Amino acid sequence: TFMIMGDTCTRACGFCDVNTGKPCDLDDLEPLRVAESVQTMELTHAVITSVNRDDLPDGGSAFFAKTIHEVKRLNPSTSVEVLIPDFKGDRGAIDNIIEASPEVLNHNLETVPRLQREIRTAASYGRSLSLLQYAKDSAFLGKTKTGLIVGMGEEFEEVIAVLEDLSQINVDIVTIGQYLRPTAKHRPIHRYVDKEEFVKYKSIGESFGIPHIESGPLVRSSY
């Protein structure tokens, strides 16, 4: 996984250990360096993610697109997955990603609707769901993907309701993993979810028609 556009985020989500503050200027050579790194490592699948860049008019979506194009130019047989922020719901920014044609467009819901305000700074469940639906309803030919972190205070039935929502908008891939607290300053772990519950999430999600679900304690959205 490559994280682009710096190491400083404009948001401060309760589960995340990325620095928050004023981000650096964009490095115009970074897309090429990412592409060269993919080439050097002979990757067959590359994941590109980023910090939130609410300081940029397009949220950094054009820079994302440039990186996708460079990776594909130097590595035509490599599939590209992007894990993107919500771009504040800006359809033009999302179009930049779609038009760059990644094989997988991933945007994480992270948690259930009730906990969104506590856990995801400046984001919302509805906006994220709309992003995924917009990609699916557009000319995007790749797969849509999202991830949930459990053990942060959600109830079993709330996760099932999210899976039902995702099935309604034809999301292709869902990951569900255990929350692990990065530091003592971050949101406490509410509980450790047992393996049987992860199995139930997978089984029920598949019964709703979701094609691919990875559900387990160590599952993470970026690989």
Predicted features, each with a name:
Residues 46-48, 80, 105-107, 174, ...:
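Hydrophobic residues within beta-strands of alpha/beta enzymes
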Residues 1-30:
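Canonical Radical SAM [4Fe-4S] cluster-binding loop centered on the CxxxCxxC motif
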Residues 46-66, 153-158:
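Conserved glycine-rich "GG(E/T)P / GGGxP" loop and the immediately following alpha-helix
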Residues 2-3, 35, 82, 144:
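Structured catalytic core of nucleotide-sugar glycosyltransferases
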Residues 32-33, 39-42, 66-78, 92, ...:
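Auxiliary Fe-S-binding modules of radical SAM enzymes
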Residues 50-59, 112-120, 183-185:
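Glycine-rich, proline-tolerant flexible connector loops at the mouths of alpha/beta enzymes
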Residues 20-47:
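Conserved alpha-helical substructure of the radical SAM core
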